[in-house]
Amino acid sequence: MATTITMQSSTILGNFILVTASFAVLIILIRVFAWDKITGIFEERANKIANDIDAAEEKLTAAANLVQQREDELVQGRIESQKIIQDAVERAKLEKKRILEQADVEIQGLKQKAQLEIEAEKREAQENLRVQVAELAVDLASKIILEDLDQQAHSNLIDRYLDKLGDK
């Protein structure tokens, strides 16, 4: 049994030495022939990742600037639209005031014209009435002169002429 254990331990030791030597040779071969290519690939990959991160940060910064610019433009647009609305309201108020003042002037003119027409018609009516009264007075006086009337006939004649005057 002791021989089996020594054999097994020498086989394990031999295998260990062989694997370790193979591994060391493999590392040396990789180091000599492929190490620069492998590290170059890793460096290239690291540079690409760093560049991608930098580009992403730049795009993020540009996007944040664009968002801020759009927000500023939106605020400016709102301010301008409020100013336009306020100006339109002010112009509308001024136009309303002007129209009302113009309407008042026209109304005053129409009132004055109507008043003048009323006064003219009143004067015309008074003149017509004066002419009619004068004609009636002359007619009545001529009748009184032509007829010698007693008191009763005189009253009847005046009443008839007053009735005639009321009909006109």
Swiss-Prot record:
SUPFAM superfamilies, sorted: F1F0 ATP synthase subunit B, membrane domain (SSF81573)
Job description of the protein: F(1)F(0) ATP synthase produces ATP from ADP in the presence of a proton or sodium gradient. F-type ATPases consist of two structural domains, F(1) containing the extramembraneous catalytic core and F(0) containing the membrane proton channel, linked together by a central stalk and a peripheral stalk. During catalysis, ATP synthesis in the catalytic domain of F(1) is coupled via a rotary mechanism of the central stalk subunits to proton translocation. Component of the F(0) channel, it forms part of the peripheral stalk, linking F(1) to F(0).
Leader sequence segment: none
Assembly mode: F-type ATPases have 2 components, F(1) - the catalytic core - and F(0) - the membrane proton channel. F(1) has five subunits: alpha(3), beta(3), gamma(1), delta(1), epsilon(1). F(0) has three main subunits: a(1), b(2) and c(10-14). The alpha and beta chains form an alternating ring which encloses part of the gamma chain. F(1) is attached to F(0) by a central stalk formed by the gamma and epsilon chains, while a peripheral stalk is formed by the delta and b chains.
HAMAP family: ATP_synth_b_bprime
Family as reported in the entry's similarity comment: Belongs to the ATPase B chain family.
Topological category with respect to the lipid bilayer: Single-pass membrane protein
A Gene Ontology molecular function term of the record: proton-transporting ATPase activity, rotational mechanism
Name of the featured protein: ATP synthase subunit b
Predominant cellular place of this UniProt entry's protein: membrane
Family annotation (InterPro entries): ATP_synth_B-like_membr_sf (IPR028987), ATP_synth_b/b'su_bac/chlpt (IPR002146), ATP_synth_F0_bsu_bac (IPR005864), ATP_synthase_B_chain (IPR050059)
Provenance organism: Streptococcus suis (strain 05ZYH33)
Keyword annotations from UniProtKB, A to Z: ATP synthesis, Cell membrane, CF(0), Hydrogen ion transport, Ion transport, Membrane, Transmembrane, Transmembrane helix, Transport
Subcellular compartments: Cell membrane
A GO cellular component entry from the record: plasma membrane
UniProt-listed Pfam families: ATP-synt_B
Transmembrane segments: 10-30
